[in-house]
Regions:
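Asp-based phosphoryl-transfer active-site loop
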Residues: 1-12
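A metal-dependent, Asp-based hydrolase signature
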Residues: 18-82
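Substrate-recognition element of Asp-dependent hydrolases with the DxDx(T/V) motif
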Residues: 76-92, 97-130, 140-145
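A generic "structured core" feature
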Residues: 90-91, 122, 132, 157-160, ...
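Catalytic cores of eukaryotic secretory-pathway lumenal/extracellular enzymes that build
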Residues: 145-152, 158
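Conserved Lys-Pro-Asp/Glu-containing loop-to-beta segment of HAD-superfamily phosphomonoesterases
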Residues: 154-180
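Acidic, Mg2+-coordinating phosphoryl-transfer loop and its flanking beta/alpha structural elements
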Residues: 175, 180-208
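Charged, amphipathic alpha-helical linkers/stalks
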Residues: 210-215
Length: 215
């Protein structure tokens, strides 16, 4: 199961709009780390990773140190906590997918999150725990993050998750909103795949804006 824009939606017009709230946090203010710099430092970190490994998946420490190379581990941790708090404030669960998780659990099926994200597994688990109903969160068996494995879903994260779980591809159904990452890449890995097309793009954007207004 995909995470962002499938299980969790952000109450913003675009995902990067979270950074405009993030730049108001004490940790980011101290460094004058604004939304624009957060975007450019992620791009720089990805370019550097491509040069070094041929792949583009990065972690939060790599992103932060692309902007501020001399950050201490404590400063990195403080920035990550601020970013997690901003995501917790912005994200909400998509009810049909929550019900899908509950239905899977009732049938005795395992639920696994596979996400293209710069969050590591502990941070993503905390985000899920803070935003999902408790029963839905407890139904999640495993979490795989592209940042931890160095591969996006398009680059082979599905196959690495299967290898870790020791299950055959055809025993798995992957559900997600992104046609390339969640449908095509999962199919290439041998999984059953379902493309969760929520709405026409203008409707999805309107729902995000409504969520922002309601919050």
């Amino acid at each position: 199961l995909d995470c962002f824009d499938t299980l969790l939606w952000r109450q913003t017009a675009t995902p990067v709009d979270v950074f405009y709230d993030l730049q108001q946090s004490d940790a980011f203010k101290r460094l004058n780390y604004n939304a624009k710099l957060r975007v450019t430092s992620e791009g720089a970190a990805r370019q550097l990773k491509i040069l070094r490994t041929g792949r583009s998946e990065v972690t939060l420490p790599e992103i932060y140190r692309a902007a501020f190379p001399d950050l201490t581990d404590a400063e990195v941790a403080e920035l990550a906590e601020a970013e997690l708090a901003a995501e917790m404030a912005a994200c909400h669960p998509f009810p049909p997918v929550v019900e899908l998780i509950r239905a899977a659990r009732r049938r005795g099926l395992k639920v696994v999150i596979v996400s293209d994200t710069y969050l590591d597994e502990p941070l993503l688990r905390r985000l899920l725990a803070a935003t999902l109903p408790e029963d839905a969160y407890r139904a999640i068996d495993r979490v795989f993050c592209s940042s931890a494995h160095g591969y996006s879903k398009v680059q082979g994260l599905h196959a690495r998750a299967l290898d870790r779980m020791k299950v055959p591809p055809r025993a798995v159904l992957h559900v997600g909103d992104h046609e390339a990452a969640d449908f095509e890449a999962a199919g290439r890995a041998g999984l059953h795949a379902f493309h969760l097309a929520h709405h026409e793009p203008w409707v999805a954007e309107n729902l995000r804006l409504q969520g922002t207004t309601a919050s």
